[in-house]
Amino acid sequence: MERQKISEKFSELREKKEGALICYVMAGDPSAEKTGEIVKALVNGGADIIELGFPFSDPVADGPTIQVAGQRSLAAGMDTQRYFELIKNLDVGIPLVCMTYYNPVFRYGVEKFVEKAADAGISGLIVPDIPVEEAADLKNSCEKHGLDLIFLIAPTTTEGRVQKILERGSGFLYLVSRLGVTGAREDVSSSTRELLSRVETGLPKAVGFGISTGEQAAEVRDAGADAVIVGSAFVKIIDEGKDVNERLEALAKELKSGIKRAS
């Protein structure tokens, strides 16, 4: 299907002087059919970009909420072929980003995985466990098929590595707002502000890991972020299984209005 490029989405939002809301959910949790409804609810709530997690049995960067979501997805039969079919069937008109660990990409074949991702309508790829120094093959395949390769930068990332990421990354930069794994937390840390001011780039800066309220989203936007990434707070609602779509849409609306208020 026709896919919107991430850069197009950010240009569109920049014209409106608006920040982006990037929503993460695990593909196939609790089922492929339900994922379609979940994505629609998030889009209705104001999501600008959707990140769809690819489940993996050893998710080193994920907090407990997302780990359990991955287990549910795998138990429901999610695999590479079904993942791409699911993506192909999503007709949402906004960029879709695949978040996956490197092992499934490597096992499937880097070139083949990226080609299938592009064919399915994916605009970008996030692979949190591949160092930028080892990502040449992946980067080449992404460039060949028109996908953005998005890297993570943490407060502990060295200056040398930050420079390599700025040279090789595209789409947006994923800034990790605190140390440790993903999960909803209470306040926006000073390390987030320091990281935003430290990284100088023309690429949009998206802050993730730990944001769960409109207030936090507004704070992150005020601190200089171009986008806010929210995952665990949505996955928790899916996990609870009660009034899921209504609550997802309501939370997305709250987050988006926080981002708009700060803009």
Curated annotation (Swiss-Prot):
CDD domains: Tryptophan_synthase_alpha (cd04724)
Catalytic residues of the enzyme: E51, D62
Pathway involvement of the protein, from the record: Amino-acid biosynthesis; L-tryptophan biosynthesis; L-tryptophan from chorismate: step 5/5
EC numbers, comma separated: 4.2.1.20
Keyword Amino-acid biosynthesis: yes
Gene Ontology cellular component list: cytosol
NCBIfam families, A to Z: trpA
Subunit architecture: Tetramer of two alpha and two beta chains.
Protein name in the entry: Tryptophan synthase alpha chain
Species for this entry: Methanosarcina barkeri (strain Fusaro / DSM 804)
Organism phylogeny: Archaea, Methanobacteriati, Methanobacteriota, Stenosarchaea group, Methanomicrobia
